[in-house]
Amino acid sequence: MSNYLFTSESVSEGHPDKVADQISDAILDAILQQDPHARVACETMCSTGLIVLSGEITTHATIDYNVIPRDTVREIGYTSSEIGFDASTCAVLTAFNKQSPDIALGVNRSKEEEMDQGAGDQGLMFGYACDETPQLMPLPIYYAHRLVEQQAKLRKSGQLSWLRPDAKSQVSVRYIDGKPKNIETVVISTQHDPDISNGDLFEGVVEEIIKPVLPAEMLSSDIRYLVNPTGRFVVGGPMGDCGLTGRKIIVDTYGGTAHHGGGAFSGKDPSKVDRSAAYAARYVAKNIVAAGLARKCEVQVAYAIGVAKPVSLMLETFGTGKVSDEKLAELITRNFDLRPRAIIHELNLLRPIYSKTAAYGHFGREEPSFTWEKTDIAEQLIADAGI
């Protein structure tokens, strides 16, 4: 189709699934702070008045599994049962095991063999980049994130004091000949105090959240703003819906523009290629687009458990490449080492950097710790491509 609408959504840090993601990554960071080589797979479930932690953790770190979830929930803004959750009074249950020794066989390596550390599981991961925004992200998901980020900023600052933590956004963009033309529909659903009128809520969201974020030149003349379409959103957070780690994988990545291998990120240490290889694939794709070798680039990489070298590598530029996809795949092999330990080393992933990733997207953000967003290989790719 040469003329179509494409839609992406995001959710706020107060959405119950994102609460779970943030708790899982806060626990991961606390462990990595003490034990960078720990094996962590932390899953979180949160419901009314309850947080349940489970998974597999092998570490010598000593952390308080009761305090970290509460601190995370408190920072998000759930401090009263009236708004759906109370960090001070919620129950926290834990049920952790250690990593299976059968899995550890393929992952653990001596110092001399560490670059041959095997993948922690089989699987396929995708990375994507395009020239629709300066951050080389698809425009719909980029602005969907910025909208809920703005909602949280205004809520925490008190500028819109009637806002509550749970919120969702959705942005529909008109594409013509493969390029974004304008934004036609914006949906914002935000939790709110019960005494705010629909009129005041609509005006506050449109004037203070939407318009300051979206570029005016991208707004269509007949743009639709759908604000709390049901008319009321007082009950939210874990009281409104049960939250689970890893249930917002499209929000976390490219908003549906690119493929997804199915593996979630949060709560997983970087020996899990679900996370580290997806970051590396973004790094590869972004450098190709930053080099001007393609307007769009999707990279797939796949692994076998216990095996260091990827079992496959695929690249697609959707007809936008300056050179053939085969040539670009050759450049990837020459310039990027996609073995798990090499990824961890190149992107410096054994650090407590993951809590920031757990809301508002893992990609397209200008955070110094997001090393997979750097474009330091672009110049070398240009030179090797010979153009």
Curated annotation (Swiss-Prot):
Its main location: cytoplasm. GO terms for cellular component: cytoplasm. Residues 99-109 are annotated as: Flexible loop. ATP binds at H15, D166, A167, K168, R232, F233, D241, R247, K248, A264, K268. One of its GO terms (molecular function) is ATP binding. Pathway: Amino-acid biosynthesis; S-adenosyl-L-methionine biosynthesis; S-adenosyl-L-methionine from L-methionine: step 1/1. It is an enzyme of class 2 (transferase). The keyword Nucleotide-binding applies. Keywords: ATP-binding, Cytoplasm, Magnesium, Metal-binding, Nucleotide-binding, One-carbon metabolism, Potassium, Transferase. Binds 2 divalent ions per subunit. It comes from the Bacteria. Pfam families: S-AdoMet_synt_C, S-AdoMet_synt_M, S-AdoMet_synt_N. K(+) binds at E43. InterPro entries: ADOMET_SYNTHASE_CS, S-AdoMet_synt_C, S-AdoMet_synt_central, S-AdoMet_synt_N, S-AdoMet_synthetase, S-AdoMet_synthetase_sfam. Mg(2+) binds at D17. Catalyzes the formation of S-adenosylmethionine (AdoMet) from methionine and ATP. The overall synthetic reaction is composed of two sequential steps, AdoMet formation and the subsequent tripolyphosphate hydrolysis which occurs prior to release of AdoMet from the enzyme. PANTHER family: S-ADENOSYLMETHIONINE SYNTHETASE. Homotetramer; dimer of dimers. Belongs to the AdoMet synthase family. This is S-adenosylmethionine synthase. The lineage of its organism: Bacteria, Pseudomonadati, Pseudomonadota, Betaproteobacteria, Nitrosomonadales.
